[in-house]
Each structure stands twice: as C-alpha cells, then as structure tokens.
C-alpha cells in the first residue's frame, strides 16, 4: 500500500510474545524490517519518545506499524513529529508545542503509520499526543493534523492477549471520552478539525456520542463476562471510532486531572476509573441548566442499555434516585476496577502538586464548570 521497504515496528511487550507478532515478522520478511521496539513506558516519558525518534531516524524507516495501546501510539505520534522538526530535548519539545498553540507553522510528520490497537483508549483515531516529564511529573499534550494514523486495523482476536485490567480500564477511558464529550464546551474551537475529518457540526452530535457510549457500555460488560467474545470486542472497537467526535465536542477535568496522575503510576484507564465519577458529581452540583441537561443524557444512556440497567439494578441503584456519580461508579465497580487513589498508594502530601499540575492542563481549564486549585484538591481528596 505504501510501497514500504523499511518498516519500523513498535509493539507492546504482551503482543510481542504472541504468534500474531511472529506472523507479522514473517509476512514482512527480515529484509523489510528496519527495526523493532518492544514496549513504551506508561504515559510515554520524554526519554522514551526521544529515543524512539532517534531510532526511527537512524534506521531510515519509511513506515511505522504499532501494536498496542495509548502509550505506544502517543510516543509514535510525537516521535514522527519531532524528526522533521529536529526536536531531541524537553525544551525543544515545549517550544514546538508552544508554536503549535500559537498556530505557527511547523514541519508536519511525514512517515506513514499503521496503528493496530489492542486497547480501547482511542488514541489511534485522534491527532493528539502527550508525553510525561519524569522529573516534574507533568504531562503535556499537543494536537497537530499530521499526527493522524494513515490506517487503523481493528482485530478483536489480537486484543484477547491484552491484560484483562488494561482492556477493561481503557474501556472506561473511552467512556470518559464520551461522557465528557457530551459537555459541548469546546465544539466551537474545533470547527476546522471537524471539517477536516468530515465531521460537520450538526444537531445530531449528542445522539452520535450517546449511541457510541451505549454500544461501548454493553460490549465492555460482555467482554468481562466472556473474555473470548470477539463480536463484543469488535463492537467495542467500533464504538471507540467515535472518540474524535466526542473529543471535538467536549472535554473536561477528568481528562485534565487524569493526565497528571499518570506519572504517579496510575494507568490511562485507571485515571478515569478514579476521577471521572467525582468530576461528574462536581459538575452536576455546580453546573447550570445546560450542563445538567447534558449530564442527564449520559444518565439516560446508561439506564437505556438493558444489560447495563440490570447490572446497575443488581447493585441496589434505582433510575429515579441515582445521580451520574452513582451510576458511573457502580458500573466501574461492576467491572472490578479500582476506585480510589489509595489503591495506588498516592499520599496526601502528593495532592498539592497534583492539583497544581492539573490546573495547568488545558482540559481542566475548559471544564464546563470553573475549577480552582482548591476545588481540584477537594476532588482528589474525595477520590482518596
């Protein structure tokens, strides 16, 4: 398809030990494999990204194939952007990000990428990528139109080898994308990007997001009940395809706070498991009528799925009395996923720095209900 002669493969460690990985190597042939990297540290530390960019450039790769989750996808996005812009240091990356924010011209990434996701984080469908400074613990995210994948291959069988908690937790991360996507607070900012995707602004965007959310809620529960259910896995993948529409419509503090939890050892999905319910409660309690209507749509979507409603009812919740915090929290607990910061040994003395980092994150700044550092601290303390 790309006429590639030198393919660079970036794979998760779990996938690299499977027959599928051996089959890929065999299909490409040794002569066409420029290099292989197995594993990227969670939340894509700058050091991993710079090393990856250096390796890809040194091998003169003309195609990159990824097999894995968000950390791998993000690292490749940034690495292929850093190569033409000669970025190899954190100050250089921060300068590049600043130029992108200022809408200044930067050299686009040009190496084509094929993403084969094995989780449900949805990064493979977006042009956003982030990396973490391990010294400061701060994660920075950027967006550029040249960071989209050229091809995304959805293979439900391949995802069966994904660790159970990673699969389920990244599913909650995608739920986070959809629920916060209903906020509608950033739709006006992404008009050009929606047009580029062919996702014109329309009155049906809430219906699209709610439909994808409902499908994901049901299919994710099905995969928990039957780990080898390939049809449910495919439906989960197909639902996650709508993540860009959600992200271009709304986003908020669950993402902003979650970005900063990563450097403390909390996985992508687990950040949403812990923080999303508390952010939703804050937004409901302090939001205006429009915010509550949109959050109400999320509640209706949970209760509108038969399998999900049965699961929620089994916990003692009723549609009449439960708020969105109750509903989302009960769903996450039904998946057997962590709900507190204490489960990751995060201490009280770390919360101040976490709140400061979260307030620097764009997603926190645009939360549909204004947040202060003290309010973020309240959310973090509730989540302990």
Curated annotation (Swiss-Prot):
Keywords (A to Z) from UniProt: Iron, NAD, Oxidoreductase
Keyword Transcription regulation: no
Gene Ontology terms, MF aspect: alcohol dehydrogenase (NAD+) activity; metal ion binding
EC number, as in UniProt: 1.14.11.-
InterPro entries to which the protein is assigned, alphabetical: ADH_Fe/GldA, ADH_Fe_C, Alcohol_dehydrogenase_Fe
A Pfam family reported for this protein in Swiss-Prot or TrEMBL: ADH_Fe_C
Cofactor(s) for this UniProt protein: Fe cation
Miscellaneous comment in the UniProt entry for this protein: Gene clusters encoding host-selective toxins (HSTs) are localized on conditionally dispensable chromosomes (CDCs), also called supernumerary chromosomes, where they are present in multiple copies. The CDCs are not essential for saprophytic growth but controls host-selective pathogenicity.
PANTHER family: ALCOHOL DEHYDROGENASE, ALCOHOL DEHYDROGENASE, PUTATIVE (AFU_ORTHOLOGUE AFUA_1G06800)-RELATED
Protein family: Belongs to the iron-containing alcohol dehydrogenase family.
Chain's role: Dehydrogenase; part of the gene cluster that mediates the biosynthesis of the host-selective toxins (HSTs) AAL-toxins, sphinganine-analog mycotoxins responsible for Alternaria stem canker on tomato by the tomato pathotype. ALT1 also selectively transfers methyl groups at the first and the third cycle of chain elongation for AAL toxin.
Name under which the protein is recorded: Dehydrogenase ALT3
Encoding gene per record: ALT3
């Amino acid at each position: 398809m790309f006429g590639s002669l030198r393919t660079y493969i970036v794979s998760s460690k779990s996938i690299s030990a499977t027959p599928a990985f051996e089959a890929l190597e065999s299909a490409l042939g040794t002569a066409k494999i420029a290099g292989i990297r197995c594993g990227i540290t969670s939340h894509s530390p700058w050091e991993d990204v710079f090393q990856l960019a250096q390796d890809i450039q040194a091998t003169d790769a003309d195609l990159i194939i990824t097999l894995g989750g968000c950390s791998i996808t993000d690292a490749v996005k940034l690495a292929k952007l850093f190569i033409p812009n000669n970025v190899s240091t954190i100050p250089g990356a921060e300068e590049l990000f600043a130029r992108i924010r200022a809408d200044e011209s930067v050299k686009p990434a040009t190496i084509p990428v094929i993403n084969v996701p094995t989780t449900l984080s949805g990064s493979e469908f977006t042009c956003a990528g982030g990396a973490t400074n391990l010294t400061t613990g701060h994660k920075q995210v950027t967006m550029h139109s040249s960071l989209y994948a050229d091809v995304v291959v959805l293979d439900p069988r391949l995802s069966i080898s994904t660790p159970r908690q990673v699969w389920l937790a990244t599913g909650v991360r995608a739920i986070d994308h959809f629920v916060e996507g209903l906020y509608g607070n950033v739709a006006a900012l992404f008009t050009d990007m929606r047009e580029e995707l062919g996702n014109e602004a329309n009155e049906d965007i809430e219906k699209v997001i709610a439909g994808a959310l409902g499908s994901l809620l049901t299919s994710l529960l099905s995969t928990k009940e039957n780990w080898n259910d390939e049809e449910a896995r495919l439906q989960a993948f197909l639902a996650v395809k709508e993540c860009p529409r959600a992200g271009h419509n709304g986003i908020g503090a669950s993402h902003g706070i979650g970005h900063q939890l990563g450097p403390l050892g909390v996985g992508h999905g687990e950040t949403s498991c812990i923080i999303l319910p508390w952010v939703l409660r804050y937004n409901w309690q302090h939001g205006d009528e429009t915010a509550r209507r949109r959050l109400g749509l999320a509640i209706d979507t949970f209760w509108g799925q038969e399998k999900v409603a049965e699961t929620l009812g089994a916990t003692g919740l009723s549609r009449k009395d439960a708020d969105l915090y109750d509903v989302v929290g009960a769903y996450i607990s039904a998946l057997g996923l962590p709900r507190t910061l204490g489960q990751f040994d995060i201490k009280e003395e770390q919360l101040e720095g976490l709140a400061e980092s979260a307030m620097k994150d764009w997603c926190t700044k645009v939360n549909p209900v204004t947040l202060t550092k003290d309010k973020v601290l309240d959310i973090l303390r509730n989540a302990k």
